[in-house]
Amino acid sequence: MIKILFICHGNICRSPMAEFIMKKMVSERGLADRFHIESAATSSEEIWNGVGNPVYPPAARKLAEHGISCSGHHARRLERSDYDRFDLLIGMESYNIRNMMRILGKDPAKKVCKLLDFAGGGDISDPWYTDDFDTAYRQIEQGCAALLEHFSAEKNIYS
C-alpha cells in the first residue's frame, strides 16, 4: 500500500483538496485499495480545543463542482511520527516544505517533496489569500495526475 500525506499551512484548502482529488483519481482507476491518502497542516491555527476546522467552504464548493465530497474532514497538524507512517509527505509550496522540515527534523529517506515536483515544478497558489480556487484546483489536479503517473511507472500499481 502506498501511503501519501498532503500538507499545507492550515489543512483547510489545498492539502484537503489534494487529498480528495487524489482519492477520486485512484478510485476511478480501481486503485483505492492500493493507496492510503490523508492530509495535514504545518500550523495549528485551524485547530481549536483539539478539534480541527472543516474544509474552508469555497474549497469544499470547488470540490463539489467536480463531484468530490470532503465531508467529515477536520484539520489536523503534521506530527513527527507521520514521517514513519507515510511513504511520501507532499507539501504544496516551498514555505510548507520549510515548515514541514521544522516539524520533522530531517528527511533521510527523501520522502518530502512538493506536489508540483511531479509536474515540472513550482508552487500551488494559496487560494486562502488569492481567492482563486479555480487555479488552485487546476494545479492540484495536474500535480495529482502526475503523481499517479509517477507511481504507475515506478511501482507498477496496475499489476
Q: Locations of the language-model features?
A:
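Conserved active-site segments centered on acidic
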Residues: 1-84, 149-159
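Phosphate-binding/catalytic loops
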Residues: 82, 88, 94-159
